[in-house]
Amino acid sequence: MKKILVTGCNGQLGRAIRQEYKGEDVSFINTDVAEGEGIVALDITDVNAVLALVRAERPDVIINCAAHTNVDACEQQWDAAYRINAIGPRNLSIAAREVGAKMIHVSTDYVFEGNGTKPYTEYDEIHPVSAYGKTKAEGEKFVREFADRYFIFRTAWLYGDGKNFVKTMLRLADSHDEVSVVCDQQGSPTSAVELARAIHHFEPTENYGTFHATCEGDTNWAAFAEAIFKRAGKTTKVNHVTSEQYAKMNPASANRPAYSILENYMMKLTDGYKMAEWQDALDEYMKTLE
């Protein structure tokens, strides 16, 4: 029986991973910062704790879904962001190498500066501008340095079972006649379910490396909100605002990529795997909320 250790198992992707493998001959070691039913408490920033658990369980695969993902908070919490987003992946990679486990690490579009004019591929040079992006970039470096067999999946605009943009918009629609949403940031909304499927597809293979993993197609946040409202039958008006206008309304907010469209180039090069169109993935997700 294959044994998989998942960190951040209570997050959007962690939950989707467990659901994706449901019914298969797989044993999960579910970990998160807090202990719970069927969940082992693990502080990934503590190398001794990570090594102790991995040595005891000897998993075949480690999937790191844990991260400090609050982009604005990262600007004020550099130390915490580095510990979770960089040191954590380092510790897991050290442990994975020791027991011969595959290391799967989830990263982000924020490793790019975000001012491009064409989709970023895995071969484009990274240049993060936010604390979140910089700490995630360091996490990638540690994985490459310490893990023998690894997959790094960069994703973007993720939503799933948990707090996310889709649910925030639907909640606002229940109490507001109109909402203001940024219209000049381009990206690819990606469901946690689709990302989990991609990870599941590549995990048994030897196609190691860095992969972009977003749903196909692209949009902007305001248009994404409109697509959500349309599918939910909401009449809430979406006011399109620029990033500059948003920054004035929220001065503590971090810099966000204006253009963060990722091309899943490595997936296409290795075995032709294709993720769903973002509209189709959103349709599937909205049905789960009915």
Locate predicted features.
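N-terminal Rossmann NAD(P)H-binding glycine-rich loop of SDR-like oxidoreductase domains
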Residues: 4-23
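Mid/C-terminal beta-alpha module of Rossmann-like enzyme folds, strongest
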Residues: 198-199, 205-252, 278
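Catalytic helix-loop patch of NAD(P)-dependent Rossmann-fold dehydrogenases
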Residues: 83, 88-91, 111-153
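NAD(P)H-binding glycine-rich loop region in Rossmannoid oxidoreductase-like domains
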Residues: 44-84
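Conserved C-terminal active-site "lid" loop/helix of NAD(P)H-dependent oxidoreductases
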Residues: 220-226, 245-290
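NAD(P)-dependent short-chain dehydrogenase/reductase
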Residues: 141-187, 193-194, 200
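NAD(P)-cofactor binding segment of oxidoreductase domains
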Residues: 76-104
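Rossmann-fold cofactor-recognition segment
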Residues: 33-46
